[in-house]
Amino acid sequence: MSNAPGTSKFQIDLRRHLRAQNICDNLVHLMCEIAEASKYVINAVRTGDLGVAGTSNLYGEEQLALDVLSDRIMRKRLIHSGVVCNIASEEMDEIYQCQASADGLYSVAYDPLDGSSLVDVNLAVGTIVSIYAGCDLLQPGRNQVAAMYILYGPRVSLVYTVGDGVHEFTMNNLMEFTLTRENVKMAPEGNIYAPGGLRNKYNAGDEKFIRHLEEKGCKLRYSGGFVPDINQVLMKGKGLFMYPALNGSPNGKLRVLFELNPMAFIIEHAGGAASNGSIPILDIVPESLDQRAPIYIGCREDVKTATSFVNGGKQEVKMAGSFVNG
C-alpha cells in the first residue's frame, strides 16, 4: 500500500494495512482479533507455567500447561469475534462449532503454540493460523482466504497473506503491530536448509538430497521450531525447510490442516513452493483433522530439486504455479 504523505511504513498498523487489501470487514476484524489474542499468548509464554497439564491431545501427545492456556486464549477470542462458525485446534479432539450459519462467516484452523516444548530452553515458538470462508475445514489449502503466523522470538512478528502478497509486522513497545516489510518475495533458489527428523531414518532419496546440499556448501540452519525455521527461509528469501517421510513414519510428522496448509499458502504467495514430494501441499484434500504429510517448502528450484531426488531423479513431480508475477 502507498504511504500517506508524512507517514512511514512503521506507522502503518495491521488494521489499516488489512483495510487496504480489498477484503471484507469481517475478515479484517477476524485477523485483528487473532493478532490481539497473540498479545496474551506472548504474555503467557513469558510468564506462564512451564509444566505439563496432565492431559493429552488428539495425537496422544502430552500437553504442556502453555499449550492448554494458549489454546484457551485463542479459542475464546475466536468465539467472541462473532465472525467464526467452526474452529479446529491442534489441542482439541474435534471441530468446535461456534455458530450454525455460515453466511459471511469463517472457519479457522490453528496451532496455538507450535514448538511449545522449546519454551523451557528459551527458543522461539509461534502461532499458526489458517482461515477458510464458510464452515468446511476439510478442503484443499488452496481454498484458504488467509493465512498468518506470529513468531515469539527476540521480537514478536506477524506475517500474513490474504492472497495478494506476503507482509510482515513487528510488535512495538505499545504492543501494536506495525508494518516492517511489504510484499516479501523469495529468490528462485538459496543456500540454507533446515532438515527435520532423524537423518538415520531418511529414505535413500532424502539422504542423497542432503549430501547434494552439503556438497554445494549450503548452510544447515535448523532450530527445531517450525515457525522460526520457516520465518528464516522466508525473510532471508532463500533456502528450504524439509520434514520428509521417515522409516516408521511414512507421512512425516507435521499436520496438513494446522501447520502445512497455512505455511504453504504464505510461501507460495511469496513466490516459493511447497510439496509433499509428489503434489503441492495446497492440493492435498485432507480427510481428517490429524492427517499428516511430508513437506519440502521454500525456494521453488530447491523444492523442485528435493522432489526430484525423492523420486529417483524423475522430473514429472507436479509443481504449482507461482502466485507472484515477474
Swiss-Prot record:
HAMAP family: FBPase_class1. Its EC number is 3.1.3.11. Homotetramer. Signal peptide: none annotated. Mg(2+) 2 binds at residues 111, 114, 259. It comes from the Bacteria. This is Fructose-1,6-bisphosphatase class 1. Keywords: Carbohydrate metabolism, Cytoplasm, Hydrolase, Magnesium, Metal-binding. The gene is fbp. Binds 2 magnesium ions per subunit. It is an enzyme of class 3 (hydrolase). It catalyses: beta-D-fructose 1,6-bisphosphate + H2O = beta-D-fructose 6-phosphate + phosphate. Pathway: Carbohydrate biosynthesis; gluconeogenesis. One of its GO terms (molecular function) is magnesium ion binding. The keyword 4Fe-4S does not apply. Substrate binds at residues 114-117, 222, 253. Its cofactor is Mg(2+). Belongs to the FBPase class 1 family. Pfam families: FBPase, FBPase_C. Mg(2+) 1 binds at residues 90, 111, 113. GO terms for biological process: fructose 1,6-bisphosphate metabolic process; fructose 6-phosphate metabolic process; fructose metabolic process; gluconeogenesis; sucrose biosynthetic process.
